[in-house]
Curated annotation (Swiss-Prot):
Residue positions binding (2R,3E)-phycocyanobilin 2: N72, R77, C82, L83, R84, D85, M86, E87, I88
Cellular compartments per GO CC: chloroplast thylakoid membrane; phycobilisome
Family listed: Belongs to the phycobiliprotein family.
Naturally occurring in which organism (per UniProt): Galdieria sulphuraria (Red alga)
Protein known as: C-phycocyanin beta chain
Record's subcellular location: Plastid, Chloroplast thylakoid membrane
Assembly and binders: Heterodimer of an alpha and a beta subunit. Dimers further assemble into trimers and the trimers into hexamers. The basic functional unit of phycobiliproteins is a ring-shaped hexamer formed from two back-to-back trimers contacting via the alpha chain subunits. The trimers are composed of alpha/beta subunit heterodimers arranged around a three-fold axis of symmetry. The phycoerythrins also contain a gamma subunit which is located in the center of the hexamer.
UniProt xrefs under InterPro entries: Globin-like_sf (IPR009050), Phycobilisome_asu/bsu (IPR012128), Phycobilisome_asu/bsu_sf (IPR038719), Phycocyanin_b (IPR006247)
Gene3D superfamilies recorded: Phycocyanins
Binding locations of (2R,3E)-phycocyanobilin 1: N35, D39, T149, T150, G151, C153
Further remark: The light-harvesting antenna system in red algae and cyanobacteria is formed of phycobilisomes. These are composed of the phycobiliproteins phycoerythrin (CPE), phycocyanin (CPC) and allophycocyanin (APC). Cyanobacteria also contain phycoerythrocyanin (PCC). The phycobiliproteins all share the same subunit composition and organization with variations in the covalently bound open-chain tetrapyrrole chromophores. Although originally identified as Cyanidium caldarium, these sequences derive from Galdieria sulphuraria.
Length: 172
């Protein structure tokens, strides 16, 4: 966001002009949208443990074979690895939300994840279901209108959903 401000100021300075009303309005909108992003990321971060835990609980309720002997999340070590991976994915989704760009999610989290899971025998479809459950929970928490920046957040919530969808697709 600061790069955008610096760019506008540099352009005006190069022309020896004050910032125009149009430029100020665009920067004001950027700040407003940035505040919404901060609110969303703050809510997701503050509720990350509950988002991951509830998603895992729902996943294992729907797919109990995962936590039964021989299942991919059977034993405490495997369960901990599953929860850790879900938390990492949620963390990188939050980075993408704040940046407004999925490249950090792709580059640092998702690239190669499917292949890693396949090599380890982790069922990608089950991981995708867990990610979908995190998505539903995170959007419900982030979309709660109490105590956040007012305004229409439907476009931002749709964007948030796309980051989770990207992660779910990447592991299948």
């Amino acid at each position: 966001m600061l790069d955008a401000f610096a760019k506008v100021v540099a352009q005006a300075d190069a022309r020896g002009e004050f910032l125009s009303n149009t430029q100020l309005d665009a920067l004001s909108k950027m700040v407003s949208e940035g505040n919404k992003r901060l609110d969303v990321v703050n809510r997701i971060t503050s509720n990350a443990s509950a988002i991951v835990t509830n998603a895992a609980r729902a996943l294992f309720s729907e797919q109990p074979q995962l936590i039964q002997p021989g299942g991919n999340a059977y034993t405490n070590r495997r369960m901990a690895a599953c929860l850790r991976d879900m938390e990492i994915i949620l963390r990188y989704v939050s980075y993408a939300i704040i940046a407004g760009d999925s490249s950090i999610l792709d580059d640092r989290c998702l690239n190669g994840l499917r292949e890693t899971y396949q090599a380890l025998g982790v069922p990608g479809a089950s991981v995708a279901v867990g990610i979908e459950k995190m998505k539903d929970s995170a959007i419900a928490i982030a979309n709660d209108p109490s105590g956040i920046t007012t305004g229409d957040c439907s476009a931002l919530m749709a964007e948030v959903g796309t980051y989770f969808d990207r992660a779910a697709t990447a592991v299948q």
